[in-house]
């Protein structure tokens, strides 16, 4: 199989086709493009149910359902005519070697940023965000994040590699500024003393979308912001295919409406994580992830 940089791949979960039927381009760094999609099939840092290593392939497969539209509703243009987007396939790493994976992912992101690419990552568990933020810090310094999740992800389990501690590690390394960052959809234990603006799930589900968007924009302003979307932010009724589901989450409609309010934000990168298709039903979780990813790209078209 052809793979990123034509490295040998003996995994059983890598993709064979691109997101939204985009052609696979295995030398993404010097290509003339705006956005690069990379699959990150990694779930060794999962504390609950594993299986998100199959997330990238499932999201790409579900994205076929979206490829037929010239103009994704409610937008009035074809994103493929406005943004130069390529899919470079899946990251290749030594199976079972977390440090090898961490180094390879960080280097891949650094190479893309060196050539001024913007990045959409398809995970994989939420640990993948940490090496990505390390790479971004070398180019942007301390940045803001918008973090969609059911969990705050700063739980200290004394484990160097833990998807539930990615935000904690990012804070310790000063990769992100919590006072200029927003967490959305949280509905498990969190500590207000960390400094994040937290729009918990109950608040989001009972507040007008325009109010939520105004709050988010007022915190982020024009700062460089990284958008990380854990699919368990959504309610399990619409996204059952994930490792640590929590009831009382966002609907897909609510998430889409919030994301559409990000058009004026300075988004420098995106990831969508924790899709575990083995627990999915009729591909609805993968379809939600694919649709949200496409919607995020639409918001990045500047007129």
Curated annotation (Swiss-Prot):
Record-linked PANTHER family: ARGINASE/AGMATINASE (PTHR11358), GUANIDINO ACID HYDROLASE, MITOCHONDRIAL (PTHR11358:SF26)
PROSITE patterns in the record: ARGINASE_1, ARGINASE_2
EC code(s) of this entry: 3.5.3.11
Assigned keywords, A-Z: Hydrolase, Manganese, Metal-binding, Polyamine biosynthesis, Putrescine biosynthesis, Spermidine biosynthesis
GO biological process: putrescine biosynthetic process from arginine, via agmatine; spermidine biosynthetic process
Its biological purpose: Catalyzes the formation of putrescine from agmatine.
Entry cofactors: Mn(2+)
Chain positions recorded as Mn(2+) binding sites: 126, 149, 151, 153, 230, 232
The protein's enzyme class: hydrolase
Record's protein name: Agmatinase
Species this protein is from: Blochmanniella floridana
NCBIfam families: agmatinase, PRK02190.1
InterPro entries: Agmatinase, Agmatinase-rel, Ureohydrolase, Ureohydrolase_dom_sf, Ureohydrolase_Mn_BS
Family: Belongs to the arginase family. Agmatinase subfamily.
GO MF assignments: agmatinase activity; manganese ion binding
């Amino acid at each position: 199989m052809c793979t990123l940089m034509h490295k040998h791949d003996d995994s059983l979960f890598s993709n064979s086709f691109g997101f939204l039927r985009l052609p696979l381009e295995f030398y993404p760094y010097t290509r003339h493009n705006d956005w690069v999609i990379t699959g990150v099939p990694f779930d060794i840092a999962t504390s609950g149910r594993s299986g998100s290593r199959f997330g990238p392939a499932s999201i790409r497969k579900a994205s076929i359902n979206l490829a037929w539209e010239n103009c994704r509703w409610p937008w009035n243009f074809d994103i493929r005519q406005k943004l130069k987007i390529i899919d470079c396939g899946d990251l290749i790493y030594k199976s079972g070697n977390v440090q090898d994976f961490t180094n390879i992912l960080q280097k891949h992101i650094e190479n893309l940023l060196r050539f001024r690419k913007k990045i959409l990552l398809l995970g994989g568990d939420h640990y993948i965000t940490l090496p990505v933020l390390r790479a971004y810090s070398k180019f942007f310094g301390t940045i803001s994040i918008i973090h969609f999740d059911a969990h705050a992800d700063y739980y200290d389990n004394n484990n160097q590699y833990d998807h539930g501690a990615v935000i904690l590690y990012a804070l310790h390394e000063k990769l992100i500024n919590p006072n200029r960052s927003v967490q959305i959809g949280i509905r498990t234990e969190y500590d207000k003393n960390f400094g994040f603006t937290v729009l918990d799930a109950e608040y989001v589900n009972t507040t007008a979308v325009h109010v939520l968007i105004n709050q988010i924009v007022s915190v982020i302003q024009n700062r460089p912001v990284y958008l990380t979307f854990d699919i368990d932010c959504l309610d399990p009724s619409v996204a059952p295919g994930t490792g640590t589901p929590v009831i009382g989450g966002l609907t897909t409609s609510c998430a889409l409406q919030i994301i559409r309010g990000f058009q004026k934000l300075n988004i420098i990168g995106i990831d969508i994580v924790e899709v575990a298709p083995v627990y999915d039903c009729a591909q609805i979780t993968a379809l939600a992830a694919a649709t949200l990813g496409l919607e995020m790209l639409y918001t990045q078209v500047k007129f």
